[in-house]
Curated annotation (Swiss-Prot):
InterPro entries: BRCT_dom (IPR001357), BRCT_dom_sf (IPR036420), DisA/LigA_HHH (IPR041663), DNA_ligase (IPR001679), DNA_ligase_AS (IPR018239), DNA_ligase_CS (IPR033136), DNAligase_adenylation (IPR013839), DNAligase_N (IPR013840). One of its GO terms (cellular component) is cytosol. It is an enzyme of class 6 (ligase). DNA ligase that catalyzes the formation of phosphodiester linkages between 5'-phosphoryl and 3'-hydroxyl groups in double-stranded DNA using NAD as a coenzyme and as the energy source for the reaction. It is essential for DNA replication and repair of damaged DNA. The gene is ligA. Its EC number is 6.5.1.2. This is DNA ligase. GO terms for biological process: DNA repair; DNA replication. The lineage of its organism: Bacteria, Pseudomonadati, Pseudomonadota, Alphaproteobacteria, Sphingomonadales. NCBIfam families: dnlj (TIGR00575), PRK07956.1 (NF005932).
Length: 721
């Protein structure tokens, strides 16, 4: 379903499902080297998530896949390494038009003329395991996998057995190599080497690897380095991380220098001066793909000028100056064997198609989401139908065609009662999702809410996973989040359970105790308030600092909204909407002020205000809230930022900026600890005005707000370092 056809509720539920699916597949791919889906299927999930987040930015979740890199390193026989410079991933493009838009986006951000040449590098994207090699004074001192981008596994002893990785870089002169330089690239296995390895593994009765990427990952991440030494691993560099200096002005020149130092780089690396050249190189590599000695899944483009890369910076998990142009995937036919219904945290009934196993891109697929009742009706799906699965990159893996819809067959009847608790299942007016009306009497919803509360993006309690939540719930030990913090009283009972020992119980209880002063934004997200997702939870806490302050603002704002209190279209508080002509004027002013305060936060609109109000007006939710806060004490929410003259202030940019784009200016402000707003109000501290500034400049003058020009803003940024 297109994003424009979705309601906010549908989008929120789909984002929740995507976050869980992608997290699962990240774990299988990065941590366990045992993926269940193809790269194209994974890309499709990520792509759909990005589309939904772009259409509904206020629904972005704290556990959003767009902010996650790889997967957190679990317990491992290999040591952990903290990356000095985060190992980022890349955003993806799937069409020529998206490549053109990427180039245009770079121009806009840098405020370049439309006809300005933007040189890019283009190289094949190897499907391997990301690795960072740290050289100090030219000698290899450490190697680490990417992990979650911040912490990876120490594989220094293992890479010593990879012939492509030199223990010492070749220097043309005494000062040719920086004192510190981290070379980053992919550890991979050539196709022929992979086939030979699997033949040896089969002959020895040992594990067969699914594909070269898994073979490379499984071979590198070995406790016994001699196992790695016996595997045919290779390495290709594609960039760098921490560096005491970068002895080049462009990406292309730096990659040539890395090659001169003795580290292999892609032989297909070229410079392109236009989007047309980039796409032409993509097609050329695509034609060579089958004949290349290693697996690739696309082409990577990077802005060539390093000073432009510095200006462009990063968003979430990816650089603005790079993108991966992925190759398309496949379609396949299979049979729909059954339709099962899953009940989610918010009561949504999601139909899941169980399929006759079908091979798509080398992976066997057995399940597919059918989204909702309307989607089943649109496709006329019935058990036994022959269907076409699409695994293209621009949508979620989905059923795109029913080949047998005209054949006589019993129709599928979507349930009108919850399969978990028997409560009536209905779709609210204007929504396509069918939801269980049982609320917290529905065990599926209660369990899902508890799972959500302890999930990685919420409280992230180690050892309290899905199976444990279900086990303790069925025993009656867990009914609400606060019960988690009372499990210490059941220590003796837990120890008596099968699979639990003194040490494992003590580890669990210690992990729970460690969360008694949780991050306030994570706690807010963990409560599962509808429409309060990732950035929204963090932005709410940035503004209100403490949870009680947020609760009071939400109660007042929702009262104002429910009573029809007027507000400006841009969400700014308008003093003219409050008149002191009654005894209740003060209270009304407070409610209006709270509403304006909430609406001034980027991404917070009436739907979020209503959701917060609904939550804090419902007696059961208040009881859960107060019970939880009797067990935990989240400290005031403070965001670490640079010490600057504008930290903590609200800034509005208006008019045309001549040396930077509006996005770049906003990114600078946020890095300095300021928050940006789209409109001027009494809460605005500073206005940065360029040529053509209009009504906002007049508003600032009327309110006595400081106004500076772009040069003064640049000086503030310079002084902050």
């Amino acid at each position: 379903m297109t994003t424009s056809a979705l309601t906010e509720a549908e989008a929120a539920n789909e984002l929740m499902r995507l976050a869980r699916q992608i997290a699962k597949h990240n774990r299988l791919y990065h941590a366990e080297d045992s993926p269940e889906i193809t790269d194209a299927e994974y890309d499709a999930l990520v792509r759909r998530n990005a589309e939904l987040e772009a259409a509904f930015p206020h629904l972005i979740r704290p556990d959003s896949p767009s902010a996650q890199i790889g997967h957190e390193i679990a317990a491992s026989p290999l040591g952990k390494v903290q990356h000095e410079v985060r190992m980022m991933s890349l955003d993806n493009a799937f069409t020529d038009e998206e490549v053109e838009e990427f180039v245009a986006r770079v121009r806009r951000f840098l405020a370049l003329p439309e006809d300005a040449e933007v040189v890019m590098t283009a190289e094949d994207k190897i499907d391997g395991l990301s690795c960072s090699l740290r050289y100090e004074n030219g000698r290899l001192v450490r190697a680490a996998t990417r992990g979650d981008g911040q912490v990876g596994e120490d594989v220094t002893a293992n890479v010593a057995h990879i012939p492509d990785i030199p223990q010492e870089l070749k220097a043309a002169g005494l000062f040719d190599i920086p004192a510190v330089f981290e070379i980053r690239g992919e550890v991979y296995m050539a196709k022929d080497d992979f086939l030979a390895l699997n033949a040896r593994q089969a002959e020895a009765g040992e594990k067969i690897f699914a594909n070269p990427r898994n073979g490379a990952a499984g071979s590198l991440r070995q406790k016994d380095a001699s196992v790695t030494a016996s595997r045919p691993l290779r390495f290709l560099a594609h960039g760098w991380g921490a560096a005491s200096e970068v002895p080049a002005a462009t990406q292309f020149e730096m990659m040539r220098k890395i090659a001169d130092w003795g580290v292999p780089v892609s032989p297909l690396l070229v410079r392109c001066s236009s989007a047309a050249e980039m796409v032409a190189h993509y097609r050329d590599i695509g034609e060579k793909r089958a004949s290349l000695p290693y697996d690739i899944d696309g082409v990577v483009y990077k802005v060539d000028r390093l000073d432009w890369q510095d200006r462009l910076g990063f968003v979430a998990k990816a650089p603005r100056w790079g993108i991966a142009h992925k190759f398309p995937a496949e379609r396949a036919e299979t049979t729909l064997d059954a339709i099962d219904i899953q009940v989610g945290r918010t009561g949504k009934l999601t139909p899941v198609g169980r399929l006759k196993p079908v091979l798509v891109g080398g992976v066997t697929v057995t399940n597919v989401t059918l989204h909702n009742r309307d989607e089943i009706g649109r496709l006329g799906l019935r058990v036994g139908d022959r269907i076409v699965l699409q695994r293209a990159g621009d949508v979620i893996p989905q059923v795109v065609e029913n080949l047998t819809r005209e054949e006589p067959r019993d129709p599928y009847h979507f349930p009108d009662h919850c399969p978990e608790c028997g409560s009536e299942a209905v779709a609210e007016e204007g929504e396509v999702d069918v939801r269980c009306t049982g609320g917290l009497i529905c065990p599926a919803q209660r369990v899902e809410r508890l799972k959500h509360f302890v999930s990685r993006a919420a409280l992230d309690i180690e050892g309290l996973g899905e199976k444990t939540i279900i086990e303790f719930f069925q025993l009656g030990w867990l009914e609400s989040p606060a019960d988690i913090f009372r499990l210490r009283k059941r220590r003796s009972e837990i120890v008596g359970r099968e699979g639990w020992k003194d040490k494992s119980v003590d580890n669990l209880l210690a992990a729970i105790e460690a969360k008694r002063q949780p991050d306030a934004a994570r706690l807010l997200f963990g409560l599962g308030i509808r429409h309060v997702g990732a950035v929204t939870a963090r932005d709410l806490m940035k503004r209100f600092v403490t949870l009680p302050a947020l609760r009071e603002a939400a109660r007042q704002a929702s009262s104002a909204a429910r009573e029809g209190e007027p507000a400006n279209a841009d969400g700014a508080y308008d003093p003219a909407t409050v008149t002191p002509d009654s005894d209740t004027a003060g209270a009304e002013a407070g409610r209006s002020d709270a509403l304006a305060d909430l609406l001034s936060i980027d991404g917070v609109g009436p739907v979020v205000v209503e959701a917060l109000g609904d939550f804090f007006h419902e007696p059961h939710n208040i009881a859960v809230w107060e019970d939880l806060l009797s067990e935990v004490s989240p400290p005031p929410y403070v965001v670490e930022t640079k010490d600057s003259a504008v930290a903590g202030k609200t800034i509005v940019f208006t008019g045309k900026l001549e040396t930077m784009s509006r996005d770049e200016a906003k990114a600078q402000a946020e890095a300095l600890g300021a928050r940006t707003a789209g409109s001027v109000s009494a809460k605005t501290d500073l206005v940065v005005a360029g040529p053509g500034a209009g009504s906002k400049l007049k508003q600032a003058a009327a309110l006595g707000i400081d106004v500076i020009d772009e040069a003064a803003w640049a000086e503030i940024v310079r002084q902050a370092g």
